[in-house]
Amino acid sequence: MGACFDLAGRTAVVVGGTTGIGRALALGLADAGADVVATGRRKAMVDEVAALIESKGRRTARIATDVGDTASLNALRDECVSSLGAVDIVVAAAGITKRVASVEMTDLEWDQIIETNLTGMMRTYRAFAPGMIARGQGRLIGIGSLASFVGLMEVAAYTASKSAVAGLTRALAIEWAPHGITVNAIAPGVFETDLNREILKGPRGQEFLMRTPMRRFGRTEELVGAAVYLASDAASFVTGQLLVVDGGLLASAVNV
């Protein structure tokens, strides 16, 4: 059974892979045997994660990328293929949020969140899908959220973007299934990262904590199993799904 989850001989690209959830997934895929390129906008952080991947005995490439730029993503694809060969697994993990009352949100704030969380994901997939279609196989994995299922207070743009991630995942899954490509997403509950650590220390964090049946926040490494599963042969017939990893929060059916 262990062989079903072995990623040896495969190449993964994690866009948004230098911080938070993306970083944990990049390192986890490397632990599972894959060669991994973890990319982001800041070259110093790209180099830092690349060194950790290399320390695990895996191959990598050090490439800074901007999900807001199609040319940058196409260049990432070309350099990955040139350095490591065909890309088997792509994780679209770039994401941002901002808590603000909807009537006070600026057009720029709205556009930045939709651009990164939704359009950036589509750009990422669009860069790598043609190669996967040509080979007749591939794994695309996005990052959803509890906001893919329910509304969250004062994060309207984030909620809209993550709801759209769910729709995009399903649409691309049925479009690309005939080409041997699976398209899925992981929907984390409340996980402590640099992005939300200060918020979780306050009253809002305590509310989430009390509404999570396991009575704790998730650790980013607890998302690795979901990513390895979706990237592996074990999930060869799984597509169009959002895999929830949330300590039971969504199942508790309370207003979050």
Residues covered by each model-derived region:
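Active-site helix of classical SDR
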Residues: 125, 161, 169
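Substrate-binding pocket helix/loop in short-chain dehydrogenase/reductase
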Residues: 101-102, 106-114, 208
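Short, small/polar-rich loop/turn modules that mediate ligand/substrate recognition or access, typified
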Residues: 177, 182, 238-240
